[in-house]
A protein has these predicted regions:
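Glycan-recognition and catalytic cores of secretory/periplasmic carbohydrate-active enzymes
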Residues: 1-261
């Protein structure tokens, strides 16, 4: 709707919200305080729904429910890399519990949309924690192998049965193409491109905001439609120094005489 302005999309959005699984009710019931109440990736994907719908119904309860949900997740299932114990089903905060790679990239995308809609820095901090800790550790540099589950206290990356909710013949921690379950090999590639797409955000006063930090360059029209190129240079999060270089793009007027002579 934000792109087309077609009213039927708002009607469809309301219908989907009304008929779909209610994440607000899930939080109110205390489901996120207990194990095995929801699949780990369904949670990562669906937790953004109340804030997506908040664009249509600006009731603060939608944002508050998501924040309360994250508090419950951190307290009862949270892991230091920003994820939660969810080795298929939600599974507590024991450091030997696994966290699925699909959950990482899907939760990153959910947080990216939450930042885009609310501008809330808590969501941005959570996004960075996953991007710079969980995601790099589960994918090989050439993107040819992946780790289905990751443990915070990961001593051995071996084929071995562990105390996961689902144990795929002991292959969950082993790096490979089809180890664990193949869904993550199809899904892992979205993590970095979508993260890059959500480094910079437009502001209501025709400005631009760097809310999530990473080396990047953006071209945009700001203020009174002035074209600029902003380069960001940083080793963040290893170094908290960030350098922004801002260049105004000036269109040079060239005079051309006809006919052309080569």
């Amino acid at each position: 709707y934000n792109l087309t302005g077609e009213d039927f999309l708002l009607e469809l959005g309301h219908l989907l919200h009304r008929q779909s699984f209610s994440f607000i009710d899930m939080v109110d019931r205390g489901d996120l305080r207990r194990p095995c109440t929801i699949h780990c990736v369904n949670l990562a994907q669906g937790i953004k729904e109340p804030i997506i719908y908040y664009q249509q119904d600006t009731d603060r309860k939608y944002i508050d429910a998501v924040k309360e949900g994250f508090r419950d997740i951190r307290r009862f299932h949270g892991q230091p890399q920003g994820m939660y114990g969810g080795d298929e089903a939600l599974h507590g905060n024991n450091p030997t519990q696994g966290s699925e790679l699909c959950s990482a990239v899907e939760l990153m995308y959910s947080l990216e949309k939450m930042v885009e809609i609310t501008g809330d820095i808590d969501f941005a901090d959570h996004l960075e924690r996953i991007a710079f800790n969980a995601l790099p550790a589960q994918i090989s540099d050439d993107f040819m192998t992946k780790q289905y589950f990751q443990q915070p206290n990961q001593v051995m990356v071996t084929r071995h049965r562990r105390n996961f909710d689902q144990d795929h013949e002991g292959t969950d921690l082993a790096f490979g193409t089809l180890t664990g379950y193949p869904c993550c090999f199809s899904n892992m590639h979205q993590g970095w491109p979508k993260f890059t797409q959500h480094l910079w955000y437009a502001t209501p006063d025709n400005g631009i905001a760097a809310i999530v930090y990473s080396p990047s360059e953006v071209t945009a029209n700001v203020g009174d439609n002035v074209p600029v190129v902003i380069s960001e240079d940083t080793y963040y999060p290893m170094d908290h120094q960030i350098t922004f270089t801002i260049k105004e793009v000036r269109n040079k007027v060239k005079q051309v005489k006809f006919p052309f002579h080569l």
